């Protein structure tokens, strides 16, 4: 097991995701030049960088240490004005100096392999379903389900194939629902509703970055690499603290539709109609 309460574990998770090939445009933590490539190419998604001083890594082999300003990341990646935004604070939690050419310490390979094997199990499950000619949609959430979620999932099921509730269960901000609660609630939902074996629960160990529109693209790219056929993008996707407009991620990702190799189901959330009940 791994300790999700350890704030440094997010970098081990990022590292494992990169090495497993789940991060489409990265094969290691980014250097300075690669970061600017991410900034220029918004369809790359959210950049994963490694700050100095993370206990899981040996920095002795590092030959490139670079500094990145908070203003740059705030303006070009998060595209917000709130300097104390939670996503920005997480990004710079260990300072403004970063590197990329490091090695994983031997004593943490067990935790690294746990992440790899957990996600590999999901990939194998998806491949098993796809081998039966199923069309698979990933439904992202970090909240417990409400009736609106059920309506969206039912729409997805009515359109085509099977739906996998696929939350990111890496590190999260204070106030987000714990992974154990999501696991318990969604499994109970599936067991109590008649979904005819078309709705599944399959989380992936990956981190929330709270990057708004850029992270919505990041989520699309991860689902492509996991092996999904389709991903749902909706209202308030991957933001926090109301710094993004409700449909900002929706509009941002829709403009880049030609850049994705999987289908996207765009929705504007669900609403209750008092007139029609």
Question: Predicted segment positions?
Answer:
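Active-site cores that bind ATP or allylic diphosphates and position pyrophosphate for catalysis
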Residues: 1-277
């Amino acid at each position: 097991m791994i300790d999700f309460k350890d704030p440094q574990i997010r970098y081990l998770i990022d590292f494992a995701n990169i090495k497993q090939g789940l991060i489409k445009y990265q094969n290691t933590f980014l250097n300075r030049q690669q970061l600017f490539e991410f900034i220029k190419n918004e369809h790359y998604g959210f950049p994963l960088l490694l700050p100095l001083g993370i206990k899981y890594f040996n920095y002795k082999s590092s030959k490139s240490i670079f500094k990145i300003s908070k203003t740059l990341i705030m303006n070009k990646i998060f595209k917000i004005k709130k300097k104390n935004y939670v996503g920005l604070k997480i990004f710079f939690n260990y300072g403004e100096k970063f590197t990329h050419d490091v090695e994983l310490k031997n004593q943490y390979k067990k935790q690294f392999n746990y992440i790899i094997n957990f996600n590999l199990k999901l990939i194998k499950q998806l491949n098993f379903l796809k081998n039966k000619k199923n069309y698979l949609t990933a439904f992202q959430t970090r909240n417990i389900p409400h009736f609106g979620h059920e309506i969206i999932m039912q729409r997805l099921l009515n359109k085509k194939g099977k739906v996998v509730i696929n939350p990111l269960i890496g590190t999260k901000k204070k106030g987000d629902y714990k992974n154990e609660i999501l696991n318990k609630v969604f499994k109970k939902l599936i067991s109590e509703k008649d979904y005819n074996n078309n709705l599944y629960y399959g989380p992936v160990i990956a981190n929330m970055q709270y990057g708004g529109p850029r992270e919505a693209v990041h989520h699309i790219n991860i689902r492509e690499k996991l092996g999904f056929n389709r991903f749902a993008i909706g209202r308030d996707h991957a933001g926090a603290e109301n710094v993004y407009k409700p449909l900002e991620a929706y509009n941002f990702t829709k403009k880049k539709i030609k850049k994705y190799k999987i289908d996207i189901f765009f929705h504007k959330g669900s609403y209750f109609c008092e007139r029609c009940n």
